[in-house]
Amino acid sequence: MDFLELEAIEGLRWSWNSWPTTKSDCESLVVPLSIMYTPLMHFSELPTIPYDPLICSRCGAVLNPYARVDYQSRIWSCPFCFHKNLFPRSYSGITETNLPAELFPTYSAVEYSPLPSRQSGSNTTTPTAAASWSNGFNQGVRSMPSNSSFSSLASSTVGGGGGVISELGPAFVFVVDASMVEDELRAVRSDVLFVIEQLPENCLVALITFDSMVRVYDLGFSECSKVVVFHGERDLSPDQIQQFLGLGYSKQFHHGKMSAIRKQSFLLPLVECEFNLTSAFEEIIPLVDVKPGHRPHRSTGAAISTALGLLEGCSVTTGSRIMVFTSGPATRGPGIIVDSDLSNSIRTHRDIITGHVSYYDKSCGFYKKLAKRLCDSSVVLDVFACSLDQVGAAELRYAVEMSGGFLLLGETFESEQFKKCLRHIFIRDADGNLSMYFDVSLEVVTTKDMRICGALGPVVSLRQKNDIVSETEIGEGGTYMWKTSTVTNKTCVSFFFHVSNEQNRKPQPGSAFFIQFITRYRYGNGAMRKRVTTVARRWVAGKSPEISSSFDQETAASVMARLAINRAEECHARDVITWLDNGLIRFASRFGDYIQEDPSSFRLTPNFSLYPQFMFYLRRSQFLDVFNNSPDETGFFRLMLNREGVVNSIIMIQPTLLRYSFDGPPVPVLLDIRSVTPDVILLFDSYFYVVIHHGSKIAQWRKLEYHKDPSHETFRNLLEAPEIDAAQLVTDRIPMPRIVRCDQHGSQARFLLAKLNPSVTQKTDHTGGSDIVLTDDMSLQDFLEDLQSLAVKG
């Protein structure tokens, strides 16, 4: 079974699928012991279990197929800590031939979605009824208390998705930049109102607009438009925001008794305020009196902080999103990016490196504090930024990433890219529920011989320690539990481990070790669910050939890319590239076959041979080589790499290239300048954009409109084939990549040429029909020759 087939079963990719038994042997691997985990990956077969999981009373692991079961005594032994646990009475029918789904050996992952029963006046979780199991068991059904903070709609029901479903849906706060030009504002209004019309009526909604001021709309006031206005310059605390909005409890006497009633009309169920919300959107007037030579006043940071303060004050626990629509940088208040005076240019990478930035560090600090509040309250921050200029995504990135939100950098809100991204967020499942996952927590349980170092991805450490947490931290470390506000079916987190040999004890080669991932989340219908993935691998001796055969070079490259961009946040890019190079030399020296001091003898086996190539393209990728990108673009690229799985990460690191010609069907070709020839069409996929490149002869024939001649049907089919394939490539990606169409020697061809291996340059002998690249960059062949020379040194 190959690594992709294993991922389809487990939702995991391992850099090494067999682990050495000692810490020193693990360190000699160079590539760390790591697992890329997609918590809510879509499986073709995922058993849904309608009751709560059984938990080991000692280590907290969930009952799984690796547990040893004594059917006579109804006892199960935890494979992680070996503690013996009693089965409850509801498992009385368990036998070797009558197993619950969580013990089926074929299920690496199961999902618990308890069917609750309501018990009036009770806030405890107790068995109250019996649900029939598909395999003949009866399991107690448990009730869960309603958690709505809105007393008028606090009751709960049972829905088809399982779990307790609050009558209140998720909350959405729409934060709109009122400094947009009229056409852009019209496009935002049209698309946002479209998705609002599709929302379930129990969803909570609010509207905030901002320019130099921040306006919070009172959606419960119908006589006229009523807003609470905040000055955009002020950085208010959550308590101050809530005080000015009048959030909290008012005391009233009813039949001689004092009662507390929540009074607010800024965040209301859609069914109560849809007309007022639509009217408020229609009344937003674009700013027209911008001073010549100045940027519009935008208080973006104050608006986001106000939206979060509103959600915090309303104690929303059903999941919530702050959705920001902006067309320029913040020019005042907390989170400011640049002064409004156009004589002050927006910061570049060089400005950040040299420290010539007025606001960058302070604004990053503001958004990092905001990120903690977002995660503490399980609020998602989505930013849709459409502008020809930078908008401050580099500063905003941390808050968006740590909350799991979407970041879109586009040119105009009238684009199909924006429409598709916005509507994708609000898609529904077969039962009509929003396909959203809120309030997500991740927990890792391991056997005693390993330690958890940390995680890299859109998660925040909860700083919960136990015996399996390492003192060495990588990324978000110092914990066995992490949190984020939301994930998607594609969100992927990289976890790092090391082997612990305390008191000189080490596991026996050939024995198994276990890792369990427990993901808790709230579905779009309000139901709480828990997905449990339990997997096993084997310990091997340090020099065992199983180590080499277990190496997954695609996962290793993805992991090293995340480590590299994590380092790049603190170090200069040149230092990060040096770190990558030194690691690659040690890796090649460790796993290459060679005669010492003889570079020509160097060989790598097939399961290692692609790894140096991945590192070559990573060093010259947009993640580390930021020369041609703005800080906003770099922040976006790194955010996407830090959340995508192995397959998409590899496309980002080493893009794919397909050749279309009259000789036959499309074929993959080398990512090399020699692949550019006049008589072919190339389809280039870098994940962030897709290029359809016509060779000079193809472009000439197209301009002569040969494809419109019925006698040249083959040529027409040749032109259509890459267009169809490009459309399929971008279909499932959010945000949708840009499709660039260009001709050989045209200006847009730079999107392709910049990513190709410069095997033919102005310094090399040039023969044949391929292009040349004007560059001083090292080619892949020179890179590999240097690697071989350094790897074979004593």
From Swiss-Prot:
Cellular compartments annotated: Cytoplasmic vesicle, COPII-coated vesicle membrane; Endoplasmic reticulum membrane; Membrane
Example GO biological process: COPII-coated vesicle budding
GO molecular function: zinc ion binding
UniProt entry keywords in alphabetical sequence: Cytoplasmic vesicle, Endoplasmic reticulum, ER-Golgi transport, Membrane, Metal-binding, Protein transport, Transport, Zinc
Ranges where the record places region Zinc finger-like: 56-81
Any Pfam family hit: Sec23_trunk
GO CC annotations, alphabetized: COPII vesicle coat; endoplasmic reticulum membrane
Binding, Zn(2+): C56, C59, C78, C81
Superkingdom as given in the UniProt entry: Eukaryota
Subunit-level organization: Component of the coat protein complex II (COPII), composed of at least five proteins: the Sec23/24 complex, the Sec13/31 complex and Sar1. Interacts with SEC24A.
Family, similarity comment: Belongs to the SEC23/SEC24 family. SEC23 subfamily.
Role description: Component of the coat protein complex II (COPII) which promotes the formation of transport vesicles from the endoplasmic reticulum (ER). The coat has two main functions, the physical deformation of the endoplasmic reticulum membrane into vesicles and the selection of cargo molecules.
Protein name: Protein transport protein SEC23 G
Upper taxonomic lineage: Eukaryota, Viridiplantae, Streptophyta, Embryophyta, Tracheophyta
Gene: SEC23G
